[in-house]
Structure formats: C-alpha cells, structure tokens
Amino acid sequence: TTTNSLTRDLARDAVNFSSKDNLAPTSITLNPAEQYQTMDGFGAAITGATCFNLLQMKPADRHAFLTETFSDNSGFGFSYIRISIGCSDFSLSEYTCCDTKGIENFALQSEEKNYILPVLKEILSINPSIKIMAAPWTCPLWMKVKSLTDLTPLTSWTNGQLNPAYYQDYATYFVKWVQAFKAEGIDIYAVTPQNEPLNRGNSASLYMSWEEQRDFVKTALGPQFAAAGLSTKIYAYDHNYDYSNIESEKNYPGKMYEDGEASQYLAGAAYHNYGGDREELLNIHKAYPDKELLFTETSIGTWNSGRDLSKRLLEDMKEVALGTINNWCKGVIVWNLMLDNDRAPNREGGCQTCYGAVDISNSYYKTIIRNSHYYIIAHLSSV
C-alpha cells in the first residue's frame, strides 16, 4: 500500500480470507469463460543515463537498490526492461554500433561495454527471468538519406529516413546486435524496428512510415531473424496512440498486419502515451485480436508535476498501469529507471525536463526519491 502522503510507503499487508458466504457490500463474480491476456511483465528503461547514475553509487548501495527493484523474492519483482540499440536521447553520447561504413565494422561500443552490459548483468544475477526488449533511435548515419524522394545522404543524428538499399545491411545490424548480447549472456526477448518512427525531432531519430516498416520487416528483418534462428519477437510501431496526427499513418500496425508477408513476422505492436487516447489499444485489439500489445514508454517531468505524488500517483495508476492492462497490453514499461536530481544525464535535443522513476542525489549518489512511476510498477510487479 502506498499513499500520496507516504504515510504508507509500499507497505505490505497480510490479507485474511474468510469462508463466510456474505461478502456484502462487495462481491466479485468470476466468469471462467471470459479470458484476457497473459502478462509478460512490468518494468522500466535501463538507459545509458540510468546506468551512469547506478554506477556512481557504492556497489553495496547499488546492489541493494537493484535487489529491492528486481528481486522476485525479496523485492518488488520488476520483470521487463527496455534498452536502446545504439544511442537514445538518454545516452552519454550519440553513437550506433556501426558508425564506420560497412556492416563488417559492427561492434558493441564503449557505452554498452562500460555501462549497459555491467548493469544488465547485475540485474540478471538478481532476477535471471527478466525480459529485455530493445529499439534503435537511429540507424547508422551512412544508411540515412534526406527522404525517399531525395536520396541525398544525411549525416545527422536527427531526422532522415533509411535508404532502402541498406535494408539487408540494417537487418544484419539487428541480428549482429542480438547475437552480441547473447554472447554476453543476455537474451533479447523482443525488438521494435524503430523507436517513435513518426518523431523527426528527437536528439537521435529516424522517420519510418508504416510502408517503410512493413517493407523492412517483410523483406529483411523478419527473414534474417528466421535465417539466424533467433526467437526474438518483433513488435511494430512503438509510438503514440494518435500516430502524430498524420492521417496516412493512422492504424500504423494494422496496415502492416494487412500484409501477410510482414504480419507473419510480427508478434504485435507497442505504444507510447505522449499523444492520443488509450482507447486506440482497444481499437487495435478488436480489429486484430490475435496480435499482442505492449505499452513501452511514458514519462513524468516538470510539465506534469512529475514529483508530486498527490497529483501523479493515482492518475498514473489509472492511465498508465491499469488503463493499459485493461486494454489488452501484456507488458507495461515506463521510461528511465533512474535519473539524478538535475534530470541528468540527458542530451541536447532530447528530453531535458524528464524525471526518472526514481531520482538520485548527484552529491553522493546515495539518497533516492521514488516517483510515481516507480510506485505503480512496484505495485503491479508485486501482485
């Protein structure tokens, strides 16, 4: 139990069940014939910024926090993690795993070796059953063009589109990345082809219409995953309920499902809540009931009183947690697990007003303040 005044702070209460027939004024009726989705888990993003902050902590303090967060025996049992393939807007620098032209130059980079992998390995030592999903914020710059009608190379981390001539190389990039993490003892449960494919303006971004994503999945990514024997799931879309109000992009994953060659490789679709209404989840489920749904990103920050539990706790439980589960999502993942008290590290052009699920003081990297997103995921994971 958690109250917004923190008079009760993730308090555990024993429940005494009664055999009495009269449960008035409350009764619960179960209908075994009506079944809903099974749950894959609940969690947060382990970004470069999160890992940086965690690794500033004393090892004993860090391990205690990670145990409290991820242990399904002595902690809250967070069970789903989202990471970036290459950089995100909360990385320590802009990079991909193949910045030198030629897919033969693929290699994990220093941020992954020095920050991401050590933290993931520590988490997995605490809870080996954690599911990890991943998404790129951008392809390598040598694969980018200004647009599909102007194939001029674009050497910018922001905006641009994937040159179709590099579909196969980019699919190989995904395969090599999944295999590289596997070689480090880390299984990747799922990927999306692109984080926020309709967002041209992030510090690292790549525009990818539904037609582009369909063609990339059916001609390159799906076949290459199959040929490599990868069991990693592929989820479409990974962006907002409102499709950025672009008429031609509405029903983005549904249009991909209508293509049988692409659909065979797609487990489902992933959504964020920075625009539109969660009713779109129900619309997609009703139209494509055999496809899965995930909720993969939401943020708190200065714009929505993100550190004020009296304003955020119940609202986030209603809209983010229960609102997505009640609309068929199998997983719920919030954004940065940990930022510091200055909302850092962050990237210019990315979100510099976001809070973490927890914030840690950057004076001594010891004092941690839990925000609403930590509480809602902790409550869901503990059930």
State what each model feature region is.
Residues 8-188, 209, 219:
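N-terminal catalytic cores of secreted or lumenal carbohydrate-active enzymes
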